[in-house]
Amino acid sequence: MVGAAGLLGPLTPVSHLEPKGWDMILSTNLTANWRLIRAMDPLLRASDAGRALFFSSSVAKTRPAFWGAYAATKAALEAIVDVYADETEKTPIRALCVDPGAMRTRMRAGAFPGEDPQTVPAAETIVPFVIDLVRPDREPPKGAVRFKDRGQESPSIDA
């Protein structure tokens, strides 16, 4: 199972966030993923190697100014996935978050409109790594996997 939906929302001071926008970002980035875990848990438990992988962001840790709602939801997502991983530790389920780093996406273009998109990797460059992480014969690392070296074509856990 892969949870990849995300909503950036407006980059604005926390005190300027509209309640409706806050609710939408929270609903998309956190609540939808919790619902996915809740709905898929029986199937993951029935699997010989259930995998629950969610996409996070470095802002879960760096928490830059004006990124309040997005940063809060990604930090909360990492927390809930860590808790779920602990709760399922004695089962075949493995849950983790992946921070792919800067990727050429619509969301990134909205956050960094002056950035040349060709200076960041295409989103599909992460696919081989994600597939490797969810292989049934692999024991994925615990917690959030973050990529420091984006010069690689296919990132690896050992990087």
What are these regions (language model features)?
Residues 2, 53, 95-98, 108:
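Hydrophobic structural elements of the Rossmann-like NAD(P)H-binding subdomain
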Residues 12-14, 21-23:
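Substrate-binding pocket helix/loop in short-chain dehydrogenase/reductase
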Residues 7, 19, 45, 49-76, ...:
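Catalytic loop of short-chain dehydrogenase/reductase
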Residues 37-38, 82:
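A short, exposed helix-loop element centered on a Lys and neighboring polar residues
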Residues 90-93, 97-98, 105, 113-159:
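C-terminal helical subdomain
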Residues 25, 34, 70:
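Catalytic tyrosine of NAD(P)H-dependent dehydrogenase/reductases that use a Tyr as the general acid/base
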Residues 4-11:
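Conserved NAD(P)H cofactor-binding loop of Rossmann-fold oxidoreductase domains
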